[in-house]
């Protein structure tokens, strides 16, 4: 699992707030 994938998931969660 690369950081790129992790960042993508975090980005989605952050967008939801």
UniProtKB/Swiss-Prot annotation:
Similarity comment text for this entry: Belongs to the phycobiliprotein family.
Cited function: Light-harvesting photosynthetic bile pigment-protein from the phycobiliprotein complex (phycobilisome, PBS). Phycocyanin is the major phycobiliprotein in the PBS rod.
CC annotations in GO: phycobilisome; plasma membrane-derived thylakoid membrane
Domain of life: Bacteria
Subunit structure comment from the entry: Heterodimer of an alpha and a beta subunit, which further assembles into trimers and the trimers into hexamers.
BP GO terms, sorted: photosynthesis
Keyword Transport among UniProt keywords: yes
Record bears the keyword Transferase: no
Protein name (database record): C-phycocyanin beta subunit
Main location: membrane
Record note on modification: Contains two covalently linked bilin chromophores.
Keywords: Antenna complex, Bile pigment, Chromophore, Electron transport, Membrane, Photosynthesis, Phycobilisome, Thylakoid, Transport
Compartments where located: Cellular thylakoid membrane
Entry membrane topology: Peripheral membrane protein
